[in-house]
Amino acid sequence: MRFFASLPLVILALISSAQAQFGFFDQMFGGQQQQQQQPQNVPSDPSQYQQRYDGSYCENYLCPDTLACVHFPHHCPCPWPANQDKFELTEGSSRICVSKGGFAAGEAARKVELARKGLL
């Protein structure tokens, strides 16, 4: 009779042991995979930029694309200086930033000069 009284305890112990082992294997080999959240795209809402622009203090000229404070607009740096070359369109006027990608040294400057003359 004692055997039948302890039988449910033995069965319960075996079941919990088996669940623990299978839980380990499930986790180890990808069972019950947890959903990973994908990063969200940045919204196309300019309000964040507008807040930073409005909150920037500059006594001279605030560059609109880099928010750098400079004395004159043509002193504005390029947003990506490692990937862009800066050119002034005319002496003391606005500047443009041209991608360095794929051009030989000086090639971007030559193309800007040809475009300025209307030859490109």
Curated annotation (Swiss-Prot):
Annotated GO biological process: ERAD pathway
InterPro entries, per database record: LCL2
Keywords: Signal
Entry superkingdom: Eukaryota
Signal peptide (residue range): 1-20
Keyword presence, Signal: yes
Family label: Belongs to the LCL2 family.
Annotated protein name in UniProt: Long chronological lifespan protein 2
Gene: LCL2
